A protein has these predicted regions:
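Membrane transport/envelope proteins' first extracytoplasmic loop
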Residues: 1-270
Protein backbone atom coordinates (compact mmCIF):
# COMPACT_ATOMS: atom_id res chain seq x y z
CA UNK A 1 0.00 0.00 0.00
CA UNK A 2 2.93 2.33 0.64
CA UNK A 3 4.62 1.65 -2.68
CA UNK A 4 3.14 4.66 -4.49
CA UNK A 5 4.40 6.92 -1.70
CA UNK A 6 7.91 5.47 -1.55
CA UNK A 7 8.62 5.27 -5.27
CA UNK A 8 7.50 8.82 -5.92
CA UNK A 9 9.38 10.21 -2.92
CA UNK A 10 12.68 8.43 -3.53
CA UNK A 11 13.04 8.87 -7.28
CA UNK A 12 10.98 11.96 -7.83
CA UNK A 13 12.95 15.17 -7.82
CA UNK A 14 14.86 14.83 -11.11
CA UNK A 15 13.47 11.81 -12.93
CA UNK A 16 9.85 12.87 -12.52
CA UNK A 17 10.49 16.62 -12.89
CA UNK A 18 9.21 17.68 -9.48
CA UNK A 19 8.14 21.32 -9.28
CA UNK A 20 9.95 23.90 -7.13
CA UNK A 21 6.52 25.24 -6.24
CA UNK A 22 3.06 26.02 -7.53
CA UNK A 23 0.41 28.72 -7.53
CA UNK A 24 -3.21 29.00 -8.60
CA UNK A 25 -4.94 31.97 -10.24
CA UNK A 26 -8.63 32.82 -10.34
CA UNK A 27 -8.45 33.21 -14.13
CA UNK A 28 -6.26 31.77 -16.86
CA UNK A 29 -3.04 33.69 -17.50
CA UNK A 30 -2.21 34.74 -21.05
CA UNK A 31 1.25 34.40 -22.59
CA UNK A 32 2.16 38.01 -21.77
CA UNK A 33 1.52 37.54 -18.06
CA UNK A 34 3.35 34.21 -17.94
CA UNK A 35 6.36 35.76 -19.69
CA UNK A 36 6.38 38.62 -17.18
CA UNK A 37 6.17 36.21 -14.24
CA UNK A 38 9.04 34.14 -15.63
CA UNK A 39 11.39 37.15 -15.49
CA UNK A 40 11.06 37.29 -11.72
CA UNK A 41 10.76 41.08 -11.81
CA UNK A 42 8.25 43.11 -9.82
CA UNK A 43 5.52 45.09 -11.55
CA UNK A 44 4.72 48.67 -10.47
CA UNK A 45 1.53 48.14 -8.48
CA UNK A 46 1.12 51.79 -7.47
CA UNK A 47 1.37 52.95 -11.08
CA UNK A 48 -1.09 50.27 -12.16
CA UNK A 49 -3.67 51.53 -9.67
CA UNK A 50 -3.04 55.15 -10.72
CA UNK A 51 -3.48 54.36 -14.42
CA UNK A 52 -6.63 52.37 -13.74
CA UNK A 53 -8.11 55.09 -11.52
CA UNK A 54 -7.33 57.86 -14.03
CA UNK A 55 -9.06 55.97 -16.80
CA UNK A 56 -12.15 55.51 -14.63
CA UNK A 57 -12.13 59.17 -13.58
CA UNK A 58 -11.78 60.36 -17.19
CA UNK A 59 -14.88 58.36 -18.08
CA UNK A 60 -16.89 59.99 -15.30
CA UNK A 61 -15.64 63.57 -15.31
CA UNK A 62 -14.50 65.95 -18.06
CA UNK A 63 -11.18 67.46 -16.92
CA UNK A 64 -11.51 70.49 -19.21
CA UNK A 65 -15.14 71.22 -18.31
CA UNK A 66 -14.70 70.79 -14.55
CA UNK A 67 -10.99 71.33 -13.80
CA UNK A 68 -11.39 72.11 -10.08
CA UNK A 69 -13.71 69.17 -9.42
CA UNK A 70 -11.41 66.91 -11.45
CA UNK A 71 -8.30 67.98 -9.53
CA UNK A 72 -10.05 67.55 -6.19
CA UNK A 73 -11.28 64.08 -7.13
CA UNK A 74 -7.85 63.10 -8.43
CA UNK A 75 -6.06 64.26 -5.28
CA UNK A 76 -8.42 62.14 -3.19
CA UNK A 77 -7.83 59.11 -5.44
CA UNK A 78 -4.05 59.46 -5.20
CA UNK A 79 -4.26 59.69 -1.41
CA UNK A 80 -6.40 56.55 -1.24
CA UNK A 81 -4.08 54.65 -3.57
CA UNK A 82 -1.00 55.68 -1.59
CA UNK A 83 -2.65 54.42 1.62
CA UNK A 84 -3.67 51.16 -0.06
CA UNK A 85 -0.21 50.62 -1.54
CA UNK A 86 1.48 51.43 1.78
CA UNK A 87 -0.57 48.68 3.45
CA UNK A 88 0.33 46.16 0.74
CA UNK A 89 3.95 47.27 0.79
CA UNK A 90 4.17 46.63 4.52
CA UNK A 91 2.22 43.35 4.46
CA UNK A 92 4.23 41.77 1.61
CA UNK A 93 7.54 43.67 2.04
CA UNK A 94 7.33 44.84 -1.56
CA UNK A 95 10.15 47.35 -1.09
CA UNK A 96 12.53 44.90 0.56
CA UNK A 97 16.04 46.32 -0.16
CA UNK A 98 17.42 42.78 -0.39
CA UNK A 99 14.93 41.73 -3.10
CA UNK A 100 16.55 39.81 -5.95
CA UNK A 101 14.91 38.91 -9.25
CA UNK A 102 14.33 35.16 -9.49
CA UNK A 103 13.86 33.90 -13.08
CA UNK A 104 11.69 30.79 -13.35
CA UNK A 105 10.14 28.49 -15.92
CA UNK A 106 6.34 28.27 -15.65
CA UNK A 107 4.22 25.27 -16.66
CA UNK A 108 0.46 24.93 -16.92
CA UNK A 109 -0.82 21.98 -14.91
CA UNK A 110 -4.57 22.53 -14.76
CA UNK A 111 -6.88 20.15 -12.92
CA UNK A 112 -10.54 19.52 -12.15
CA UNK A 113 -11.94 18.28 -8.85
CA UNK A 114 -14.57 15.70 -9.79
CA UNK A 115 -16.69 13.18 -7.90
CA UNK A 116 -15.50 9.57 -7.88
CA UNK A 117 -17.80 6.56 -7.83
CA UNK A 118 -15.30 3.70 -7.81
CA UNK A 119 -17.88 0.90 -7.41
CA UNK A 120 -20.45 2.34 -9.85
CA UNK A 121 -23.32 2.23 -7.37
CA UNK A 122 -24.51 5.67 -8.44
CA UNK A 123 -23.19 7.43 -5.36
CA UNK A 124 -19.93 9.35 -5.04
CA UNK A 125 -17.56 7.86 -2.47
CA UNK A 126 -15.09 10.75 -2.59
CA UNK A 127 -13.26 13.29 -4.71
CA UNK A 128 -10.90 12.68 -7.59
CA UNK A 129 -8.47 15.32 -8.85
CA UNK A 130 -8.02 14.87 -12.58
CA UNK A 131 -5.02 16.09 -14.58
CA UNK A 132 -4.37 15.89 -18.29
CA UNK A 133 -1.29 13.87 -19.21
CA UNK A 134 1.81 16.04 -19.68
CA UNK A 135 5.54 15.61 -20.20
CA UNK A 136 6.74 18.87 -18.65
CA UNK A 137 6.46 18.78 -14.87
CA UNK A 138 5.21 16.71 -11.91
CA UNK A 139 5.22 13.45 -13.82
CA UNK A 140 3.70 10.18 -12.65
CA UNK A 141 5.49 6.90 -12.01
CA UNK A 142 3.65 4.02 -13.68
CA UNK A 143 3.36 1.14 -11.19
CA UNK A 144 0.95 -1.14 -13.05
CA UNK A 145 -0.69 -1.20 -16.48
CA UNK A 146 -0.30 1.71 -18.89
CA UNK A 147 -0.84 5.43 -19.20
CA UNK A 148 -4.17 6.50 -20.79
CA UNK A 149 -4.17 6.85 -24.58
CA UNK A 150 -7.91 7.10 -25.30
CA UNK A 151 -10.49 9.65 -24.12
CA UNK A 152 -12.29 7.09 -21.94
CA UNK A 153 -9.15 5.73 -20.25
CA UNK A 154 -7.83 6.78 -16.85
CA UNK A 155 -4.88 6.03 -14.56
CA UNK A 156 -5.47 6.46 -10.82
CA UNK A 157 -3.32 6.54 -7.70
CA UNK A 158 -1.99 3.11 -6.74
CA UNK A 159 -2.43 3.54 -2.98
CA UNK A 160 -6.03 4.72 -3.39
CA UNK A 161 -6.77 1.82 -5.75
CA UNK A 162 -5.37 -0.69 -3.27
CA UNK A 163 -7.43 0.78 -0.43
CA UNK A 164 -10.75 0.69 -2.29
CA UNK A 165 -10.21 -2.50 -4.29
CA UNK A 166 -9.88 -1.09 -7.81
CA UNK A 167 -7.63 -2.93 -10.28
CA UNK A 168 -6.40 -2.36 -13.82
CA UNK A 169 -9.22 -3.27 -16.19
CA UNK A 170 -11.99 -2.08 -13.86
CA UNK A 171 -14.29 0.82 -14.68
CA UNK A 172 -14.97 3.80 -12.43
CA UNK A 173 -17.33 6.75 -12.79
CA UNK A 174 -16.02 10.31 -12.69
CA UNK A 175 -18.91 12.73 -12.12
CA UNK A 176 -21.21 10.24 -13.84
CA UNK A 177 -18.85 9.55 -16.76
CA UNK A 178 -17.41 6.03 -17.19
CA UNK A 179 -13.65 5.54 -17.54
CA UNK A 180 -11.64 2.34 -17.88
CA UNK A 181 -8.76 2.09 -15.41
CA UNK A 182 -5.73 1.27 -17.58
CA UNK A 183 -2.98 2.14 -15.10
CA UNK A 184 -2.04 2.62 -11.47
CA UNK A 185 0.31 5.52 -10.85
CA UNK A 186 2.03 7.68 -8.24
CA UNK A 187 2.34 11.38 -9.04
CA UNK A 188 5.63 12.79 -7.80
CA UNK A 189 3.86 15.80 -6.23
CA UNK A 190 1.33 13.58 -4.44
CA UNK A 191 3.66 11.21 -2.59
CA UNK A 192 0.99 11.46 0.11
CA UNK A 193 -2.62 12.08 -0.82
CA UNK A 194 -3.21 15.50 0.67
CA UNK A 195 -6.15 17.18 -1.06
CA UNK A 196 -5.07 20.60 0.26
CA UNK A 197 -1.61 21.82 1.19
CA UNK A 198 -3.03 22.80 4.60
CA UNK A 199 -4.35 19.30 5.37
CA UNK A 200 -2.61 17.68 8.34
CA UNK A 201 -3.75 14.16 7.45
CA UNK A 202 -3.90 12.50 4.06
CA UNK A 203 -6.87 10.44 2.96
CA UNK A 204 -6.17 7.64 0.50
CA UNK A 205 -9.76 6.40 0.55
CA UNK A 206 -11.92 9.47 -0.09
CA UNK A 207 -9.37 11.36 -2.19
CA UNK A 208 -7.83 10.17 -5.44
CA UNK A 209 -5.54 11.69 -8.07
CA UNK A 210 -5.83 10.67 -11.70
CA UNK A 211 -4.48 11.14 -15.21
CA UNK A 212 -6.51 11.25 -18.41
CA UNK A 213 -5.78 12.34 -21.96
CA UNK A 214 -6.35 15.97 -22.94
CA UNK A 215 -9.48 14.84 -24.77
CA UNK A 216 -10.68 13.07 -21.64
CA UNK A 217 -9.96 16.16 -19.56
CA UNK A 218 -11.93 18.35 -21.96
CA UNK A 219 -14.92 16.00 -21.71
CA UNK A 220 -15.31 16.67 -17.98
CA UNK A 221 -17.39 19.56 -16.69
CA UNK A 222 -16.27 20.67 -13.22
CA UNK A 223 -14.48 23.99 -12.83
CA UNK A 224 -10.94 24.12 -14.21
CA UNK A 225 -8.38 25.14 -11.61
CA UNK A 226 -5.75 27.38 -13.21
CA UNK A 227 -2.81 25.74 -11.52
CA UNK A 228 0.76 26.65 -12.50
CA UNK A 229 4.04 25.15 -11.39
CA UNK A 230 7.48 26.66 -11.51
CA UNK A 231 11.09 25.58 -11.55
CA UNK A 232 13.92 27.97 -10.81
CA UNK A 233 16.25 28.73 -13.72
CA UNK A 234 19.16 28.59 -11.26
CA UNK A 235 18.73 25.68 -8.86
CA UNK A 236 19.10 26.70 -5.19
CA UNK A 237 22.22 25.34 -3.51
CA UNK A 238 20.48 24.55 -0.23
CA UNK A 239 17.30 25.06 1.77
CA UNK A 240 18.35 28.54 2.91
CA UNK A 241 18.76 29.74 -0.67
CA UNK A 242 15.56 27.97 -1.67
CA UNK A 243 13.64 29.87 1.04
CA UNK A 244 15.14 33.19 -0.08
CA UNK A 245 14.25 32.50 -3.71
CA UNK A 246 10.68 31.53 -2.89
CA UNK A 247 10.19 34.69 -0.78
CA UNK A 248 11.49 36.94 -3.56
CA UNK A 249 9.56 35.12 -6.26
CA UNK A 250 6.32 35.46 -4.28
CA UNK A 251 6.73 39.25 -4.16
CA UNK A 252 7.32 39.44 -7.90
CA UNK A 253 4.48 37.03 -8.68
CA UNK A 254 2.01 38.91 -6.49
CA UNK A 255 2.72 42.25 -8.18
CA UNK A 256 2.50 40.80 -11.70
CA UNK A 257 -0.79 39.07 -10.92
CA UNK A 258 -2.35 42.18 -9.35
CA UNK A 259 -1.30 44.33 -12.32
CA UNK A 260 -3.04 41.90 -14.66
CA UNK A 261 -6.29 42.18 -12.70
CA UNK A 262 -6.15 38.62 -11.39
CA UNK A 263 -6.06 37.07 -7.94
CA UNK A 264 -3.52 34.70 -6.44
CA UNK A 265 -5.59 31.92 -4.85
CA UNK A 266 -2.79 29.63 -3.71
CA UNK A 267 1.00 29.81 -3.39
CA UNK A 268 3.13 26.93 -2.20
CA UNK A 269 6.91 26.62 -2.60
CA UNK A 270 8.38 23.15 -2.23
Amino acid sequence: ANESMLVAANEGVTKYKLEDGHFELDKKADETLLAAIETGTKADVRQYYLDKAKKELDEKLDEKAYPEAYDKAWDKIVEEIDDKYADAEEKYELNDPDFTEVPVKIYENFFRNEEEDYNNDGEAEGNIRVYAKNDNVDLACLLDGAFPEKADEIAIDRMHADNVGVKVGDEISVSGQRFKVVGLIAYVNYATLHEKSTDMMFDAIKFDVAMVTQEGFNSLHKTVHYFYTWNYVDTPADEVEQKAKSDDFMKALLTQVVCDDKELEDYMPR
